[in-house]
Amino acid sequence: MRQDIHPKYSEITVTCSCGNSFSTRSTAGKDFHIEVCSACHPFYTGKQKLLDTAGRVDKFRQRYNLKS
């Protein structure tokens, strides 16, 4: 087998917008910032929460004259 053909697999820190952070390993080589993690995602927390990305829900409601 050929040597040195695989990317480097290093430890990175993933930080969520809720403030939660954890360490994992990745070939990306830099830290990640994510919007939703298992600590704040409605499926894992059991709380109903509307996740609006870039105002898309508001644009939809405005287009069809729906109340919030």
From Swiss-Prot:
Keywords: Metal-binding, Ribonucleoprotein, Ribosomal protein, RNA-binding, rRNA-binding, Zinc. GO terms for cellular component: ribonucleoprotein complex; ribosome. Binds 1 zinc ion per subunit. SUPFAM superfamilies: L28p-like (SSF143800). GO terms for biological process: translation. GO terms for molecular function: metal ion binding; rRNA binding; structural constituent of ribosome. PROSITE patterns: RIBOSOMAL_L31. Its cofactor is Zn(2+). Part of the 50S ribosomal subunit. HAMAP family: Ribosomal_bL31_1. This is Large ribosomal subunit protein bL31. The lineage of its organism: Bacteria, Pseudomonadati, Pseudomonadota, Gammaproteobacteria, Chromatiales. The gene is rpmE.
